[in-house]
Regions:
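Divalent cation-coordinating acidic motifs and surrounding scaffolds
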Residues: 4-236
Length: 236
C-alpha cells in the first residue's frame, strides 16, 4: 500500500523489501493522468524510486498515456484495461516477474452490478514460483450498513463481490499462491454484521489481510490519510 502523500517525502530515502522477497503494492493513482505530463513524470519517478516487483493500479483514465509512460520506465512493463469507467492494470519489474497470462474475469452482464470494473488476473512466476494476483476496484460509497438483498445498496454489492471472488479463488486456485488486492472501498475493521469482508475474515486458515496492522493503527499510516480512510487492501 502507498500513502497518497508519499511524493511529499524525499524519494531517495524510500526503502521497501529486499532482493529476495516478492514486493508488491496497490495504488489508486486517481484519474491518471489527472494533471497531464506532470502526473506522468511524478508517477514515473515514484515507480523507479520504490523498485517494487509488482504494482496493482486503479483509476487509469487514459490507457494510451499509461502505455506511453511505461515505455519510458527502464526495467518495467505494464498492462492496463479500460472498462466503461476507469481502468485498472499492473506494473511489473521485467527482471523478476515472468508473465504466464493476463486476463479479465466476471465480464458477463450478470456480474456488472457487483463488479463495475472487471477484475484483472495476472498469472505470473517469481523465482520459479507461480503466483496469481487479482486486482480490483470495487463499488464506492454507502452508509456503512449492509442491506441484504438490496442490489442497489453499495455495501451489499461489495459484500457480494468479495464472496464471488473468494468462491472463484477457492475453486480455480485452491493450492496456488493467490493474492487479491486493490481499492476495495471498505473498511476491514467494521463490526461483523456490517463488514463486507466477513466471508474472508471467517476463513483465517486460508486468508489474511497483509495490511491488517495498518488498518487498526493510526490514521497517518492509512492509504488515504488526509480523508482519513483505509480502503485499499492486500489479501493473501
Amino acid at each position: 500500500l502507498i500513502s497518497t502523500n508519499a511524493y511529499n517525502q524525499n524519494l531517495s530515502n524510500l526503502q521497501f523489501g529486499t532482493d529476495s522477497t516478492l514486493d508488491m503494492m496497490t495504488w489508486n493513482i486517481e484519474f491518471f493522468p489527472k494533471a497531464g505530463q506532470n502526473t506522468i513524470d511524478s508517477v514515473s519517478k515514484i515507480i523507479q524510486a520504490l523498485e517494487m516487483d509488482v504494482i496493482a493500479v486503479q483509476e487509469i483514465e487514459d490507457t494510451s498515456a499509461f502505455r506511453t509512460m511505461m515505455l519510458s520506465i527502464p526495467g518495467y512493463a505494464g498492462f492496463a484495461r479500460l472498462n466503461s469507467y476507469l481502468g485498472m492494470g499492473f506494473i511489473y519489474k521485467t527482471s523478476s516477474i515472468q508473465i504466464n497470462a493476463l486476463y479479465e474475469i466476471f465480464t458477463a452482464q450478470q456480474y456488472w452490478n457487483y463488479f463495475p470494473r472487471a477484475p484483472i488476473v495476472m498469472d505470473m512466476n517469481y523465482m520459479n514460483e507461480r503466483y496469481i494476483l487479482i486486482v480490483n476496484h470495487l463499488k464506492c460509497c454507502g452508509d456503512g450498513y449492509i442491506d441484504l438483498g438490496n442490489t442497489d445498496d453499495e455495501e451489499y454489492r461489495r459484500a457480494q463481490a468479495v464472496a464471488i471472488l473468494k468462491q472463484y479463488v477457492d475453486t480455480s486456485f485452491p493450492t496456488e499462491k493467490t493474492i487479491i488486492l486493490g481499492d476495495l472501498n471498505d473498511l476491514i475493521t467494521d463490526q461483523p454484521n456490517a463488514n463486507v469482508f466477513q466471508v474472508i475474515l471467517n476463513d483465517p486458515s486460508n486468508y489474511s489481510f497483509a495490511d491488517a496492522s495498518i488498518a487498526s493503527g493510526p490514521s497517518s499510516n492509512w492509504s488515504f490519510p488526509t480523508w482519513p480512510s483505509h480502503l485499499d487492501h492486500i489479501i493473501i
